[in-house]
Amino acid sequence: MQYPVDTHTHTLASTHAYSTIHDYLAVAKQKGIRLFATTDHGPAMADAPHFWHFVNLRVLPRMVDGVGILRGIEANIKNREGEIDYFGDYLSQLDIVLAGFHEPVFPPSDKATHTEAMINAIKSGKVDIITHPGNPAYPIDIEAVAAAAAEYGVALEINNSSFEVSRKGSEANCTAIAKAAKELGATLVMGSDSHVAFSLGGFDRALSIIEAVDYPKDKLLNRSPMALLNFLTQRGHQSVADLMPLFSDDIA
């Protein structure tokens, strides 16, 4: 099965990434990706886009040549309280909010601190998807995080990039996360975490983890555009309402 949705990509606006929106659209057409989110790093990262970048994402068209675009952010979890670096009414203008730990913003400390910070971010109501929770630099109480994600309707990401170019040693943690998500009823999503358009929709390694634990694929948010759009609507993102008619032929 091909998965036509990618929730995690970075553009030239994050200056350690190398592609434009146009590049992603071209690759999406080649690969059969029907919906992707542009989610550049939140402003607290040293080379992140300016705050205005996210405010002005509204200028992006909803669909180009049959490919839908979600306007989003990969925010930074900043502290033990689970606060992120994007706020206020501006959050409600975005279609999708990802958040995770990044060393320049929230240096690794200990398992209890990481767990508390991640669970507080989940409970905040501001974050739709927790990115790369399997990062071995940030050990967490996996069962506690998965339970919170299930309770608060937040998805946990199995990050494909973690097995290829960064966060080496993530396999065991990601397998444990997928198992806990299955057992506790949490939602999973695969993210390419593309920093160059060629890797858009690349889920091979993440999918192997999901298949190994027999996680139900009908709960994967990547399974269809409507599956993700329905999830985001339930999360309170009314901004995606104008995308939904464009996928009226889709089966969630």
From Swiss-Prot:
One of its GO terms (cellular component) is cytosol. Its EC number is 3.1.3.-. Pfam families: PHP (PF02811). It is an enzyme of class 3 (hydrolase). Zn(2+) 1 binds at residues 8, 10, 74, 193. Zn(2+) 2 binds at residues 16, 41, 195. Zn(2+) 3 binds at residues 74, 102, 132. SMART domains: POLIIIAc (SM00481). One of its GO terms (molecular function) is phosphatase activity. Its cofactor is Zn(2+). Binds 3 Zn(2+) ions per subunit. Keywords: Hydrolase, Metal-binding, Zinc. One of its GO terms (biological process) is bacterial-type flagellum-dependent swarming motility. HAMAP family: YcdX_phosphat. Belongs to the PHP family. This is Probable phosphatase Shewana3_2794. It comes from Shewanella sp. (strain ANA-3). The lineage of its organism: Bacteria, Pseudomonadati, Pseudomonadota, Gammaproteobacteria, Alteromonadales.
